[in-house]
Structures are given as structure tokens and as C-alpha cells.
């Protein structure tokens, strides 16, 4: 699939959908904020360069008591040292990216690129280097020393050494799998709470839409990153239309596949061209999943870590158990959220837009399915999956959630029955019984075990 390809029947003169500069894109860009910091440092240097007081000014002796030659030597030394430090920083960053991709999940690479500390260190080092060479260019043996520039380089040089030491400690901490799991969990939890409204019943909404309708094919291929509802609402109200979007953030679409279904208020024909143009503006399609509106991405990252941990090349079931523990916390939070489709009405109260949404079964399947299949012969991980289901069972708020939890539990027990020796199978079945106790509301019996890696009494 080629990202950004268009349908054969499209007019080549029609403008492509605009490129959106979003906060997430800027945050995930490893070069943008360091470049801004470097540019600001150069501008500040140029503004300070004309300040060249003579030796009679006492404060200049406090900032820089020596002459032009010594100042030039300082700037040369700082520039050389900072480039060495920048090389070390880039090397450590590349090692971190390689380790995250090979040992944990390729979907974690974006988290390293959007790390604020890494961008700050690169910005300080790059800014210090540019200030040094800019100041060196402005040195003149026939003129007084630009003391403010030299003082700035002196301060930035000290700051560069400090941030390099802090960065090494930060990288060492970031490469720990527990830190990666914590960051993925916290980011997913923040997106989850921004995306889904609280619902004490956890019931999904149903919306009565007329039969039929006009399918709207997509004009671009890629992955849905965000959905901007406002331009769609404006177009739908103006033209008297009702739309149901068939895709959602995280979905992969191809040219010609249906992305929406549209009805006219009066039952007449739908202006397909105008609808497609508005959809192209509203659907941000890229080449990778982003966390802005994609709650499932964080769960996918944690599931990837669990699956990778139980692979033959790593063979670390304890890490897999811990990853399922983080997933359990997210799944418990999802139980009291309004999942599924959402409806949006115009100022007159007329239903105009219905968006698609994932249900609780989707999230449970996404977490439990891959881990259960890859851990079919590892009792530690299968017990952790059942422990996750027990936590979800203890907080389930409706019968549909209980049914899904019971279905997942039975699949784990069926897997264990065909793969485990008797002693391991009995341990897993004991946890399966505790899932049933939690579903029945007997929490004392459900949580009185001593087994597992993350809970004991």
C-alpha cells in the first residue's frame, strides 16, 4: 500500500487534503523543538553581539576579565566539546530506539521521539554550538569583547555538561521495561479519559438511522489518525445531510473502501463530491497510528511488550505478567466509560453525525487474545491473564461485560487444559474459579489466593 495514493477517477487538479500541523505531530518531531531552541539562541546572540563596552566598564571585568584571544579560545573549546556531547546524545538515542524496537515493541519508537527531555537536551546542545560559532564569527581583535555573548557561551557550556549527565541518567531509566510500561499506561489513560465520557452503567448507545443511504468511498490510503468533527457538522447542516462515519482512529483504509454512509433529510440525492471533500478535510490519514484519539494504541503497546517478553528469544514471563497488570487497570477504567458510537446534533437538535466506536469486547480480545495464544504453555502468564479478568470481574457494571469476561476466562482454561501438566493446570483452574467468584460478587473468595507475580496475601 502506498500512503497518500488517490483513486483513479479523481481529478488531478483537485487540491490534496491539507497537511495538518497538530500538537501531536510537533511533539513527536525530534527536530522541531531543538531547531526552535537553536534559532532562538542564534537570534539572541545576534542581539547581544553589538554590546561591546570598553574596559572602563567595571561590570565587564566581572563577566569576562580577559581579552579577545582568550574569549575566542573559550568559544572554540565550547563548540568542540558540545559537538562531542551531541554525538554521545545521538548515539544513546539511537541505541534506545534500537532496543525499544527489537526487545519491546516497534510502536514504542514514537514515544522516544516525543520525549520532552531528549528534545530539551538536543536543543541546549545545538543552541550552545550555534551560539559559540556565531560569537566566534563576530570576534574582532580591533574591537572590544562582546562580553554578553561570551558570558552566554560560558553559562550554556556549563548547562550543556549538566544536561548531558542528566540525559545519561534519563536514558538509563527510560530503557527499563518497567518505565516503558508505565509511560505507555499513563499516556493511554490520559487519552482514554479525554476520549470517553464517564458512564456508571457502561451501556453502549444505539441510534436509529434510516435504511439504505449512500456509501462514500475513501480517496486516500493510510491509517486514520484523527477525526475532526466540526467541518463535517458545518457541511452536514448546510446541505441537510446525516452521516455515519464507518471508520475510526487506528483503522487502516484503502482507496475506494467505504468510509461513511450519508442520507439526505429530504430523501433526495447526496452531493457526493462535496461530501468527499469535507471528509478529506475531516479525516487525518497518515502512515502510522498516533495516540491523539486512538485509545487502543496504548493497549496495543502494552500487549506487544507482553507478547515480545514471552517470545523464545527473550523468554521473560514475569515482564509479560506485569504488562497484563497495566492492561487490567486500563480495562477496569473502560468499564465505566461510554463506549461505542457517539451522536452529534446541530444547534437545532437535529441528528447530523454518528461516529463509530469500539466496544468492550474489542478491548478485551485485543489484550487477552494475543497473550493467551502466545503463552499457551506458560502458567505464569496465563494466570496473569486470569488475574486481569478477575480484576475486571470485580468491577464489571453490566451483564454484557460479565459475559465477555466469562468468555475470555473459558478460552484461557481451554488453552491450559490442552497444554499444561496437571499441577500447572490446577493452579490455572484455581484462578479461573476465582474469576467466577468475582463475577458472582464474592470478592473475599476471589482475592484470597497467594499465587501470582503481582498479588499475594
Residue ranges of model-derived segments:
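Membrane-anchoring hydrophobic segments
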Residues: 1-76
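Short basic (Lys/Arg) and small-residue
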Residues: 2-20, 144, 148-150, 166-244, ...
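Membrane-interface segments at loop-to-transmembrane junctions
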Residues: 19-35, 63-80, 105-123, 144-153, ...
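A residue-level detector for conformationally permissive "hinge/kink" positions
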Residues: 33, 73-79, 83, 214, ...
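Transmembrane alpha-helix detector for multi-pass membrane proteins
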Residues: 37-56, 66-140, 161, 165-168, ...
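Generic detector of multi-pass transmembrane helix bundles and their immediately adjacent loops
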Residues: 152-164
Amino acid at each position: 500500500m502506498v500512503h497518500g495514493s488517490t483513486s483513479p477517477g479523481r481529478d488531478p487538479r483537485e487540491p490534496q487534503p491539507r497537511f495538518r500541523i497538530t500538537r501531536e505531530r510537533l511533539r513527536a518531531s525530534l527536530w522541531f523543538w531543538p531547531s526552535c531552541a537553536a534559532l532562538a539562541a542564534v537570534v539572541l546572540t545576534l542581539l547581544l553581539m553589538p554590546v561591546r563596552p570598553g574596559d572602563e566598564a567595571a561590570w565587564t571585568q566581572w563577566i569576562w576579565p580577559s581579552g579577545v584571544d582568550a574569549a575566542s579560545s573559550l568559544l572554540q573549546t565550547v563548540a568542540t566539546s558540545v559537538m562531542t556531547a551531541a554525538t554521545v546524545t545521538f548515539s544513546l538515542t539511537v541505541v534506545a530506539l534500537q532496543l525499544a524496537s527489537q526487545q519491546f515493541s516497534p510502536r514504542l519508537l514514537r514515544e522516544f521521539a516525543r520525549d520532552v527531555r531528549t528534545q530539551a537536551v538536543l536543543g541546549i546542545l545545538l543552541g550552545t554550538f550555534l551560539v559559540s560559532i556565531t560569537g566566534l564569527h563576530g570576534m574582532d581583535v580591533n574591537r572590544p569583547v562582546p562580553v554578553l555573548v561570551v558570558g552566554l557561551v560560558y553559562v550554556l557550556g556549563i548547562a550543556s555538561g549538566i544536561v548531558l549527565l542528566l540525559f545519561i541518567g534519563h536514558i538509563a531509566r527510560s530503557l527499563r521495561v518497567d518505565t516503558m510500561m508505565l509511560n505507555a499506561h499513563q499516556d493511554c489513560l490520559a487519552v482514554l479519559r479525554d476520549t470517553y465520557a464517564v458512564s456508571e452503567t457502561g451501556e453502549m448507545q444505539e441510534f436509529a438511522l434510516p435504511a439504505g443511504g449512500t456509501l462514500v468511498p475513501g480517496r486516500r490510503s493510510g491509517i486514520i489518525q484523527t477525526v475532526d468533527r466540526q467541518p463535517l457538522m458545518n457541511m452536514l447542516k448546510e446541505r441537510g445531510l446525516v452521516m455515519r462515519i464507518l471508520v475510526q482512529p487506528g483503522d487502516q483504509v484503502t482507496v475506494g473502501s467505504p468510509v461513511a454512509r450519508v442520507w439526505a433529510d429530504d430523501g433526495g440525492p447526496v452531493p457526493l463530491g462535496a461530501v468527499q471533500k469535507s471528509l478529506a478535510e475531516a479525516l487525518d490519514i497518515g502512515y502510522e497510528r498516533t495516540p491523539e484519539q486512538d485509545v487502543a494504541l496504548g493497549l496495543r503497546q502494552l500487549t506487544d511488550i507482553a507478547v515480545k517478553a514471552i517470545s523464545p528469544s527473550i523468554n521473560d514471563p514475569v515482564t509479560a505478567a506485569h504488562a497484563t497488570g497495566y492492561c487490567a487497570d486500563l480495562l477496569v477504567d473502560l468499564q465505566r466509560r461510554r463506549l461505542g458510537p457517539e451522536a452529534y446534533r446541530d444547534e437545532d437538535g437535529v441528528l447530523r453525525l454518528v461516529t463509530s466506536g469500539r466496544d468492550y469486547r474489542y478491548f478485551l480480545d485485543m489484550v487477552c487474545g494475543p497473550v493467551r495464544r502466545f503463552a499457551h504453555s506458560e502458567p505464569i502468564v496465563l494466570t496473569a491473564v486470569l488475574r486481569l479478568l478477575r480484576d475486571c470481574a470485580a468491577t464489571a457494571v453490566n451483564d454484557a461485560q460479565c459475559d465477555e469476561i466469562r468468555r475470555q476466562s473459558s478460552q484461557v482454561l481451554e488453552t491450559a487444559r490442552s497444554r499444561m501438566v496437571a499441577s500447572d493446570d490446577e493452579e490455572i483452574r484455581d484462578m479461573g474459579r476465582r474469576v467466577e467468584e468475582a463475577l458472582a460478587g464474592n470478592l473475599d473468595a476471589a482475592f484470597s489466593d497467594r499465587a501470582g507475580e503481582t498479588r499475594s496475601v
